[in-house]
């Protein structure tokens, strides 16, 4: 694990974005951990979050021209990632996001920010069912752009209804690469290294054994 990944896990724990316990997911599964990126909700939180997204993006070394943040959660993520890339990597990257409702007055349309053209890096918090990604793909295609990759905070590495995870399905269906700041495997490595969270480690491993992707 890279230093920024360890720091991100500790940041998520500190802000209670990452919690351990018993949580019922939309899928109906009972998960021993829960990740709620909406709790990164102050200016300082967002500034730090952007640095982690930017670090993961630099680490992945994927070519892209524009950051796209799907409404609504992707909007602040795209914004703070663009700021972090400028501040810490001297990269002035255009960013764009969509409105849920088309505007009839002013500049009109559903897109705000830069033009959506060239190679697009889509940024979001997590991929649960892949629905938001599929909606974003329609917007990207409508604008004649190409999806270069998808960047999220956490990859749960968890099967969907079939054997593949939602992320693996997105990679297959859109012939793209999904990168994440951390994966479930990183979280398990972190718990193992701490030695003080053995009860959480056991339940997370059991959950992975039952629902994890191969």
UniProtKB/Swiss-Prot annotation:
Annotated InterPro entries: OPRT, Or_phspho_trans_dom, PRibTrfase_dom, PRTase-like
Function: Catalyzes the transfer of a ribosyl phosphate group from 5-phosphoribose 1-diphosphate to orotate, leading to the formation of orotidine monophosphate (OMP).
SUPFAM superfamilies: PRTase-like
The keyword Glycosyltransferase is assigned to this record: yes
Pfam families: Pribosyltran
GO CC annotation, single: cytoplasm
Catalytic activity line of the entry: orotidine 5'-phosphate + diphosphate = orotate + 5-phospho-alpha-D-ribose 1-diphosphate
Biological source species: Pseudoalteromonas translucida (strain TAC 125)
Residue sites binding 5-phospho-alpha-D-ribose 1-diphosphate per the record: 26, 72-73, 99-100, 103, 105, 124-132
Top-level taxonomic group: Bacteria
EC nos: 2.4.2.10
The protein's annotated pathway: Pyrimidine metabolism; UMP biosynthesis via de novo pathway; UMP from orotate: step 1/2
The family this protein is said to belong to: Belongs to the purine/pyrimidine phosphoribosyltransferase family. PyrE subfamily.
Cofactor(s) for this UniProt protein: Mg(2+)
Name listed for the protein in its UniProt record: Orotate phosphoribosyltransferase
PANTHER family associated with the record: OROTATE PHOSPHORIBOSYLTRANSFERASE 1-RELATED
């Amino acid at each position: 694990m890279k230093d920024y990944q360890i720091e991100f896990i500790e940041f998520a724990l500190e802000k209670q974005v990452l919690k351990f316990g018993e949580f019922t997911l939309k899928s109906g599964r009972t998960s021993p951990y829960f990740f709620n990126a909406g709790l990164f909700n102050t200016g300082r939180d967002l500034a730090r979050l952007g640095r982690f997204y930017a670090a993961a993006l630099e680490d992945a070394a994927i070519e892209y021209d524009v950051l796209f943040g799907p409404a609504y959660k992707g909007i602040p993520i795209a914004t703070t990632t663009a700021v972090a890339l400028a501040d810490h990597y001297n990269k002035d990257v255009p960013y764009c996001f969509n409105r849920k409702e088309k505007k009839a007055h002013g500049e009109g349309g559903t897109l705000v920010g830069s033009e959506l053209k060239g190679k697009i890096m889509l940024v979001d918090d997590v991929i649960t069912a892949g629905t938001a990604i599929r909606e974003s793909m329609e917007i990207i295609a409508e604008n004649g752009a190409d999806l270069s990759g998808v960047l999220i905070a956490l990859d749960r590495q968890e099967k969907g209804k079939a054997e593949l995870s939602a992320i693996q399905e997105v990679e297959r269906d859109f012939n793209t690469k999904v990168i994440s700041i951390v994966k479930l495997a990183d979280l398990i490595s972190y718990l193992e290294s701490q030695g003080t969270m053995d009860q959480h480690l056991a339940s997370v491993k059991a959950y992975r054994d039952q629902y994890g992707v191969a």
